[in-house]
């Protein structure tokens, strides 16, 4: 399966569940055969203001790829700015 230029080895994708899909849980799912990891939902404003808890939600390790991040917010300009910034990090997919 492919999403854009991201190759996913199977059709099993982890949903971005707030309070659930932290790094240890994602690694466990990857170990069990999940093809696409996804972080918890992340607030664009929290990223803008460098919120430490939000940075913790986005922690990752190379072995969990491909990795998607789901970004939410209400201001289109902030969303666009943060999506662009996050695209320069280790995420393969930014879901807005």
Q: Over which residues does each language-model region extend?
A:
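Glycine-rich, positively charged N-terminal anion/phosphate-binding segment
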Residues: 2, 17-92
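Short beta-strand/loop segments at the ligand-binding rim of alpha/beta enzyme cores
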Residues: 7-12, 65-68
């Amino acid at each position: 399966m492919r999403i854009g230029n991201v190759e996913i080895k199977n059709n099993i994708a982890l949903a971005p569940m707030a309070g659930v899909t932290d790094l240890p849980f994602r690694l466990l799912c990857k170990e069990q055969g999940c093809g696409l990891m996804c972080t918890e939902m992340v607030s664009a404003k929290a990223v803008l203001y460098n919120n430490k808890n939000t940075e913790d939600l986005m922690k990752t390790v190379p072995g969990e790829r491909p990795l998607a991040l789901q970004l939410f917010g209400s201001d289109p300009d902030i969303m666009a700015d943060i999506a662009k910034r996050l695209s320069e990090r280790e995420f393969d997919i930014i879901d807005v």
